[in-house]
Amino acid sequence: MRLFAIGDLHLPGGEEKPMDVFGTQWENHMERISEDWREKVQDEDVVLIPGDISWAMQLRAAVPDLELIGRLPGKKVLLKGNHDYWWNAISQVRAHLPEGMYAIQHDAVETDAAIICGTRGWMLPTTEAEQTQEDEKIFHRELMRLKLSIEAAMALQSPKPLVVMMHFPPLFEAERDTPVTELLAQYPVHTVVYGHLHGAGIRAGFNGEWKGIRYRLVSCDALDFRLAEVALKDL
């Protein structure tokens, strides 16, 4: 059983939302992702999708996109991104998921290879950009939700590696000590996967080990629209 990750699929949600307006690299992006997915993923594998799944504004409009993902091999674990406006009450979201798909919200799920938890996150307070009062409020709320999700994972008392999903970056290449990384360091986190960064912003992302935890940027254009395997061997 293997673990993969890819985020920011930005499926159309029943609307004309051609992603190539963001650059020619986005042409037929889901077809390319699907082809790579089918080549790599077996039914027993798990794929993590950390947010920005569909442009849909309502849950019913997101259902065809969820069904498209559901037809691809493997089990899937989903996390809400900042553009997932269709993601409302978690009970309703879960009721509309195809078999073999799980949505995380303030909790954790145990797979055959790892424990998965996480939260959306928010814009980090950095030396490059100040937070507004509203940003600060949302950020601290997301920090508490991350702690809640990790605590749910710890309550499972499993020896399996702990993998955290986030949508917003928990750190940057130039700024690695953040309130998020400080919280993560309090727990036996093995790997963190995150997305949100696109285009020129990809260069700001951090990939590698920081204070004993692996971090991997998995927004789909950062991966050239190919799934990333999450290595679960000991650090």
Roles of regions detected by a PLM:
Residues 1-4:
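Extreme N-terminal starter segment of soluble prokaryotic enzymes
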Residues 38-39, 154, 230-233:
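Short amphipathic alpha-helix with an adjacent loop that forms part of the alpha/beta core around
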Residues 7-10, 51-54, 82-84, 107, ...:
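Active-site metal-binding loops of divalent metal-dependent hydrolases
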Residues 9-12, 87-175, 234-235:
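Conserved catalytic scaffold of divalent metal-dependent phosphoesterases
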Residues 15-111, 176-189, 211-219:
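Core catalytic region of metal-dependent phosphoesterases/phosphodiesterases
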Residues 47, 162-164, 192:
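Receiver (REC) domain switch-region micro-motif
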Residues 14-19, 90-91, 128-129, 177, ...:
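Short aromatic-enriched loop/helix-cap "lid" or pocket-rim segments at secondary-structure transitions
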Residues 77, 170-235:
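Conserved beta-sheet core of the metallophosphoesterase superfamily
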